[in-house]
Curated annotation (Swiss-Prot):
Domain comment quoted from the record: Forms a beta-barrel structure that accommodates hydrophobic ligands in its interior.
An example Gene Ontology biological process: fatty acid transport
InterPro entries: Calycin (IPR012674), Fatty_acid-bd (IPR000463), ILBP (IPR031259), Lipocln_cytosolic_FA-bd_dom (IPR000566)
Organism of derivation: Rattus norvegicus
GO cellular component: cytosol; nucleus
Protein name per its UniProtKB record: Retinol-binding protein 2
Lineage of the organism: Eukaryota, Metazoa, Chordata, Craniata, Vertebrata
């Protein structure tokens, strides 16, 4: 595993995305559209500074952060909530905690070989996404 997450990553699999979205109270119609989409992630990393773009034909979401620095995040590309977000390193894995009205919310992201792994959590729901480097 490596800490380097730079690159363009295309989605290969998206397990339990609907369950994750239900836990976020995302409406039925949006969930039905979103589960059929393929996402592309573009990550520009300079040490602990990240600029990320998640693109699909339905919605795009940009997130810029510095590891270890808490910030206010508006999750407009997903459920439209305001959360306090902190991303840290655990070994070579980025671990994000999002504090707000939903319990146990956040994500983990790491690279192994030419694959980017992302686990999204809300409540008791975990979505597992795998991306391949383009």
């Amino acid at each position: 595993m490596t800490k380097d997450q730079n690159g363009t990553w295309e989605m290969e699999s998206n397990e339990n995305f609907e369950g994750y979205m239900k836990a976020l109270d995302i409406d039925f119609a949006t969930r039905k559209i979103a589960v059929r989409l393929t996402q592309t992630k573009i990550i520009v990393q300079d040490g602990d500074n990240f600029k990320t773009k998640t693109n699909s034909t339905f919605r795009n979401y940009d997130l810029d952060f510095t590891v270890g620095v808490e910030f206010d995040e508006h999750t407009k590309g997903l459920d439209g909530r305001n959360v306090k977000t902190l991303v840290t390193w655990e070994g070579n894995t980025l671990v994000c905690v999002q504090k707000g009205e939903k319990e146990n919310r956040g994500w983990k992201q790491w690279v192994e070989g030419d694959k980017l792994y992302l686990e999204l959590t809300c409540g008791d729901q975990v979505c597992r996404q795998v991306f391949k480097k383009k």
